């Protein structure tokens, strides 16, 4: 963050389930493309830990692969998602990577994740979905 001339931000690469925060509650937590590594049971526990890390009113910004369509649409929507992949891995996910993701990772549904966020004590302030597979949430600790 030094090159961005930001002095009040500390980047802490850490596991949702293993991180032991040594200080006081924080103002902001950002996660990108990490939560889908956990099955839903552990997602809820991870989100509860993030909630506990934030001060009341603190903000959690979550960006991840989240499916925002109905189960009956899954085959067609996943096929379209994979079809829209890039060829150059430097520009994004390739078709092989997206296929592996669906096969091996734990992305969940928007209608599962949103109640999970609320259950652990977050207020969802803003939600955006792109291509039915990428979710961005801005949440506040209540």
Locations of the language-model features?
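A short glycine-rich, Lys/Arg-flanked "PGG" loop and its adjoining helix->strand segment in the class I
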Residues: 44-56
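Short catalytic micro-motifs in class I SAM-dependent methyltransferases
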Residues: 33-34, 64
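C-terminal alpha-helical "lid/dimerization" subdomain adjacent to the S-adenosyl-L-methionine
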Residues: 63-120, 127
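A conserved beta-strand element that flanks and buttresses the S-adenosyl-L-methionine
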Residues: 30, 61
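Core SAM-dependent methyltransferase catalytic element
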Residues: 114-142
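Conserved SAM-binding strand-loop segment of SAM-dependent methyltransferases
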Residues: 4-18
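A short acidic, Gly/Pro-enriched loop at the edge of an enzyme's catalytic core
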Residues: 21-29
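A short His-aromatic
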Residues: 36-38
């Amino acid at each position: 963050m030094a090159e961005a001339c930001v002095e009040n931000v500390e980047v802490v690469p850490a596991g949702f389930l293993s991180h032991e925060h040594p200080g006081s509650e924080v103002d902001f937590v950002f996660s990108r493309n990490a939560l889908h590594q956990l099955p839903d049971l552990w997602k809820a526990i991870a989100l509860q830990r993030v909630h506990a890390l934030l001060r009341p009113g603190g903000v959690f910004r979550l960006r991840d692969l989240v499916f925002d369509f109905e189960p009956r649409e899954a085959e067609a929507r996943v096929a379209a998602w994979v079809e829209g992949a890039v060829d150059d891995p430097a520009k994004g996910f390739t078709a092989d990577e997206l296929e592996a993701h669906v096969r091996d990772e734990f992305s969940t549904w928007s209608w599962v994740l949103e109640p999970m966020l609320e259950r652990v004590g977050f207020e969802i302030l803003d939600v955006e979905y792109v291509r039915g597979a990428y979710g961005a949430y801005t949440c506040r600790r209540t």
